[in-house]
Amino acid sequence: MSRITGINGRIIYNSRGSKTIEVDITSDEEFLGRVCAPSGASVGKYEAASFPNNGPEESLALLKNNSDKFIGSDPTDLKSIHDIIRTIDDTENYSKIGGACAFAITIAATESAARLQNVPFYKIINPNGDLKFPFPIGNILGGGAHAGPGTPDIQEILIASTGAKTIHDAIDMNLQVHKELRNTIQKNDPTFTNGRGDEGGWAPKYDNEKALEISATAIENLGFTLGKEVSLGVDFASSTQWDEQKAKYIYSRAGFENDPGEQIDFAADIIEKYKLTYAEDAVHE
């Protein structure tokens, strides 16, 4: 049986310029898995803590102080890797080691196992499952916590090239729409300065409806059928709109409020009107 023979970590910077952690796991002295951990801009209160209170440095110190616990483990046995992590941190929300570090350890072990066995990564996770083509999701328009004042309340408008036959075509189609959306916004608003949110989506001064309309227009300008060749998605990030005292969703930029029932109708209308293939966090928590 193969064994983990080395584990290490380091502090790196993510695309927002914030510190995160990267973990290396080596199996049988040769097969390296390396993973850097993501973390979101808007998080829920039930979500695993990305890092302990003192940040990724505390995660890294805990990893290094407990690295010997992983040595000799089978990298293909994800349950055993998880169990080791839980001996280090038994808190409900990973507040000691951080969910980001736990994620990086688990996926680095899986990547190391895949290289060890010379199989694709997914074969380690699900060796006997049906294969389906994954559609990469691209962020084309940002609002909410990802962009500045005047942008939409909803956090992201995304696309998936659901008509693509290959990963190359899917990425190419996503990029085409991203570029066309900039052109479409510029024609609609000559004052647009090509501003972007922190994940690369364009950040125009539009309300929710206008942002969705112009995103759909950009898709159709390229000759694609909305909901067929290219589909829209929305990350509502509704917890950022939720007001606990009022028990309502406050859309301050658009100038309206939703009670919980109205919020469900609001999201359902967008899903139906724009033929969404993807909807994230449409309600609080």
Where are these regions (language model features)?
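Hydrophobic faces of well-ordered beta-strands that scaffold small-molecule active sites
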Residues: 136-141, 194-204, 228-234, 279-280
